[in-house]
Amino acid sequence: MRRAVCPGSFDPIHNGHLEVIARAAGLFDEVIVAVSTNYAKKYRFPLEERIDMARETLASLRGIVVEPVGEGLLAEYCRQRGVSAIVKGLRSSSDFDYELPMATMNRQLSGVETVFLPTEGHYLHLSSTLIKEVFTLGGNVSDYVPRSVLKRLLAGESS
């Protein structure tokens, strides 16, 4: 079985993420969407809610598993789960410049390859950070996030 991992914080998961994950699902037998927590970041949604959003939005895709990734190296996580590839979406050359050193280190540590998928043009500008900022400032993000995510954003606005 060819297994890949798509790691990220997914705060929140958006249509650009979904597009990359769906394409990865066409390339691998199983894709683990590994939802992470970086303690240096401030999150809008707690880990369990980010996992729930990913599961809800990816439920129709075959071969997708959503789970938290614990602390530690992604290379070790891949080795423990028999992952042969890390899949990363690239929006720009700055994404590549950021991701390449990590891809090289992951390959050296565990032998796992990183597969870079260029993001579709209409998603090139999307990031979870930008979506949260636009939403917080009153902008409409409904074209950029799944309906279930939009509902959670709106629900959090009133609490």
From Swiss-Prot:
Localization (cell): Cytoplasm
Pfam family, one: CTP_transf_like
Site positions (Transition state stabilizer): 17
Enzyme class at the top of the EC tree: transferase
Associated pathway: Cofactor biosynthesis; coenzyme A biosynthesis; CoA from (R)-pantothenate: step 4/5
Binding site for substrate: 9, 41, 74, 88
EC number: 2.7.7.3
One Gene Ontology MF term: pantetheine-phosphate adenylyltransferase activity
InterPro entries with a match to the protein in the record: Cyt_trans-like (IPR004821), PPAT (IPR001980), Rossmann-like_a/b/a_fold (IPR014729)
Stored Gene3D superfamilies: HUPs (3.40.50.620)
Reaction equations catalysed: (R)-4'-phosphopantetheine + ATP + H(+) = 3'-dephospho-CoA + diphosphate
GO CC term, one of those recorded: cytoplasm
Entry keywords, A to Z: ATP-binding, Coenzyme A biosynthesis, Cytoplasm, Magnesium, Nucleotide-binding, Nucleotidyltransferase, Transferase
Cofactor(s), names only, from the UniProt record: Mg(2+)
GO-annotated biological processes: coenzyme A biosynthetic process
Residues that bind ATP: 9-10, 17, 89-91, 99, 123-129
Record's subunit section: Homohexamer.
Function, as annotated: Reversibly transfers an adenylyl group from ATP to 4'-phosphopantetheine, yielding dephospho-CoA (dPCoA) and pyrophosphate.
NCBIfam families xref list: coaD_prev_kdtB (TIGR01510), cyt_tran_rel (TIGR00125)
Similarity-based family: Belongs to the bacterial CoaD family.
Protein name: Phosphopantetheine adenylyltransferase
Source organism of the structure: Arthrobacter sp. (strain FB24)
Gene: coaD
